[in-house]
From Swiss-Prot:
Catalytic activity from the UniProt record: uridine(54) in tRNA + (6R)-5,10-methylene-5,6,7,8-tetrahydrofolate + NADH + H(+) = 5-methyluridine(54) in tRNA + (6S)-5,6,7,8-tetrahydrofolate + NAD(+); uridine(54) in tRNA + (6R)-5,10-methylene-5,6,7,8-tetrahydrofolate + NADPH + H(+) = 5-methyluridine(54) in tRNA + (6S)-5,6,7,8-tetrahydrofolate + NADP(+)
GO molecular function terms listed in the Swiss-Prot or TrEMBL record: flavin adenine dinucleotide binding; tRNA (uracil(54)-C5)-methyltransferase activity, 5,10-methylenetetrahydrofolate-dependent
Gene responsible for this protein: trmFO
Lineage: Bacteria, Pseudomonadati, Pseudomonadota, Alphaproteobacteria, Rhodobacterales
Record's protein name: Methylenetetrahydrofolate--tRNA-(uracil-5-)-methyltransferase TrmFO
Gene Ontology CC terms: cytosol
Record's subcellular location: Cytoplasm
Known function: Catalyzes the folate-dependent formation of 5-methyl-uridine at position 54 (M-5-U54) in all tRNAs.
Domain of life where this protein originates: Bacteria
Amino acid sequence: MAESLHIVGAGMAGSEAAWQAAEMGVPVVLHEMRPKVGTFAHRTGQFAEMVCSNSFRSDDDERNAVGLLHWEMRAARGLIMEMAAAHRLPAGGALAVDRDPFAESVTARLRAHPLISVVEEEVAELPSSGNWIVATGPLTSSALAESLRALTGAEALAFFDAIAPIVYAETIDMEVAWRQSRYDKGETEDERTAYINCPMNREQYEAFIDALLAAEKTEFHEGETAGYFDGCLPIEVMAERGRETLRHGPMKPVGLTNAHRPEEKAYAVVQLRRDNKLGTLYNIVGFQTKMKYGAQTAVFKMIPGLENASFARLGGIHRNTFLNSPTLLDDRMRLKLRPNIRFAGQVTGVEGYVESAAMGLLAGRMAAAEILGRDLPPPPPETAMGALVTHITGGAEAKSFQPMNVNFGLFPPIDARGGRRGRKDRYKAYTDRAKAAFTEWLGA
């Protein structure tokens, strides 16, 4: 029997790492502190709980870097992608999932695996021996973060993710709102009508911005650094950057036609995306916020169609802790000071569910290979996974290192025509090259 691999944290990264290692024949001990020790953002003790959005973003594997990452994870028989497919919700060209059944299914599959044992406990310090993957995510416990800081001498960087509110569908006024995906994207009627749209004229938009800016906000605790990841900015922070910022961001009106008044062009549009399979819950897209609860209710009810809305969950903020990975990790995701420990997921400085799961997939495979006496190099940088792991383990500038989503800017350049059509061709060239390289890496 091979040595055991210990994995700390059963989020996206830890769950995927455990699955990959166990499928390679390595016994896994999965340590998860929930539900015994909770966090601000989690509601349950389920594995791979989605605490922010319910979307894995674009599923276009030909011209989108996130979609390509989906493709690579499916090719590697990833558990997260398998369960996402099983609990998929209509969302235009995006991959959105029914979050609770998704997490329950991931949990059930891992608990049922004969080579995986689950220990419900907090790991408070970095172990000096054994094979470990730390995948504790953005809410790494204070004790473990302090242990890491003591070992590395490095300050863990901190920023904040904001959580979007969720509305009960039956309380949305569909005489004002209408169903449509932007540019009518999607192959089925469900996909083409996956979003609920609430229009605003200029006067309504200006009043909404005024209310956002004036609303009471949650203050940061003493000693916390008020930094944000740009992909998850609170709407009030976006509004502070300029009054027009929101209508060029999550409230942009392009690609949408008011079903009730097709001749009227909205000045801004608020979109809601289905949050569960039943279609009883919808989250307000891009509306993560740190407004206080009372202020949220008042401000969001200014949105046409949501005047009488009831909220299943209001927005909030949570802290995100991550390593300066280019300084601390080697190209196999091992801690240079203690190579028996790997890191995976958001704690390494990737941002997003899919990116976190992908780094878990790599860490699990590389750790298992090492235990089995094999050397498994990271995927080539031409692949989505390879581009991400190269970025966090040395490609990024250490002094200015910040969490990163996967994007084609991380890939080695490719020659292609310029212009709008040329850009689409170039993205296709990136994904064609990546798929060939990833297939070769999988078969090696």
